[in-house]
């Protein structure tokens, strides 16, 4: 059984930002397409994605320079945690993940789970304006995507089941700003998502 320990540490003494930084939160189950689309959107629109710090090793499909994480040793992770603090910290099966405040300040898109998004919206609302986009895909399509990236059915079901409780609650609450049903080709999904983000950024400029 997958063991998940989640806690959040908000660094004290942070200066309040007068104009709220706009950050898009990409949330979705395993293989919903959120991470691939986030990378494409960043390249296309010139945006930057939050990269969390982790003690796990890179996967074989994580291309150098395009990873969603900074891979560090246990000692380096603890050093960063002590010196900078983490806005969010999660431990999954003994593997640690953390995100610093400055990383979010300097980024535009954050691929995050529902619990992390809830915490950020509750504790960082004075510094950031978060727009929450929930990526939903049909079960069989998500499984097919997962298998095409060299994952196994066993691994897919394990991940899907381990995240089911928090996502079921999240889906029932419907607290997101946009529901993005990703049941289309990558190119069509990318085009639709680009239009959505550009629209939101234009609204922000007009304020």
Q: For each of these PLM feature ranges, what is it?
A:
Residues 26:
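Hydrophobic anchor at the beta1->P-loop junction of P-loop NTPases
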Residues 54-116:
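ATP-dependent small-molecule kinase phosphotransfer cores
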Residues 32:
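ATP-binding Walker
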Residues 109-113, 127-147:
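Conserved phosphate-donor/acceptor-positioning beta-strand/loop module used by diverse small-molecule
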Residues 29:
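P-loop (Walker A) phosphate-binding loop of NTP-binding proteins
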